[in-house]
Design a protein with these regions (language model features):
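N-terminal amphipathic, basic helical "cap/leader" segment at the start of enzyme domains
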Residues: 2-148, 152-153
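Conserved beta-strand/loop scaffold segments within soluble protein domains that form the structured core
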Residues: 122-126, 131-253
Length: 253
């Protein structure tokens, strides 16, 4: 069986569960993503942008997923550390693909109106922003020879939550927003992460994405980061990774 078919079967068998545990706006593009993924599958090394990475092979093993959106057992703000020397940051954690509620100390340096929040919580206060921008860039991500990017389609198919970073017009971050993604599970696990960065006109700031692993399990991550900048806005996005050889990560910006 081709790798993508097992995920299409999973999606169709558990569509109600996937949608029930996700904000409604995330369900809208799933059917189109399923149609395109079924038509073209996942890329292999014959696809130029995956010349050295066989996605078809990477997604073949049977990984667990958190479709019921169970919260991490440990408080990541107490259990994990990711310090960047000589750099003060506003720190936020995502464990596997669950954005974790942040303590007040993580927001001390954020200017008024800046939002760093899970889609599932931000939808109640910034639903219009999420509706307007979610999947807008991802749906145009494509390999010009084979069509849409299969890994991005798979992410859209299964993503149930994400992290919104919103900078209102004119906001200027005093320190970078640091998002620490931690893969931690008792069995081989697949994370489906989504990050949406929206900077309105004149806003300025930096986002630092850090990836770490716990334990010796095999981890597979598909991550899609969408960034939108208004007139005169400046957004810098950095990515750092400190993981082990059993970790495979597909990240699309």
């Amino acid at each position: 069986m081709k790798s993508h078919l097992q995920y299409l079967e999973l999606f169709r068998a558990h569509r109600d569960l996937i949608d029930a545990a996700a904000p409604a706006f995330m369900g809208a593009p799933r059917e189109e993503a399923a149609r395109l993924l079924e038509a073209q599958g996942l890329p292999d090394s014959r696809t130029e942008r995956y010349k050295y990475t066989d996605a078809e092979a990477a997604f073949a093993p049977d990984y667990g997923l958190n479709l019921r959106r169970l919260a991490p057992q440990a408080d990541p703000y107490a259990a994990y550390k990711c310090n960047v020397p000589n750099l003060s940051t506003s720190l936020f954690f995502v464990v596997n693909d669950v954005p974790c509620p942040a303590p007040d100390s993580s927001r001390v340096l954020l200017p008024e109106g800046v939002v760093v929040e899970a889609f599932s919580r931000a939808v109640h206060t910034h639903g219009e922003i999420l509706q307007r921008y979610y999947n807008r860039a991802a749906q145009t991500d494509r390999d010009f020879r084979t069509g849409h990017d299969g890994v991005t389609l798979l992410n859209t198919l299964l993503a149930q939550d994400g992290l919104l970073v919103y900078l209102p017009a004119g906001a200027q971050l005093k320190a970078p927003i640091q998002v620490v993604n931690v893969s931690a599970a008792k069995a081989d696990f697949m994370s489906v992460r989504r990050i949406l960065v929206v900077a309105e006109a004149g806003a300025k700031g930096a986002v630092l994405l850090c990836d770490h692993t716990e334990g010796s399990q095999r981890y597979l991550t598909t991550q899609v980061v969408e960034v939108f900048a208004g007139d005169g806005a400046e957004v810098e996005v950095y990515s750092m990774e400190e993981t082990h050889r059993q970790n495979t990560r597909f990240s699309t910006l």
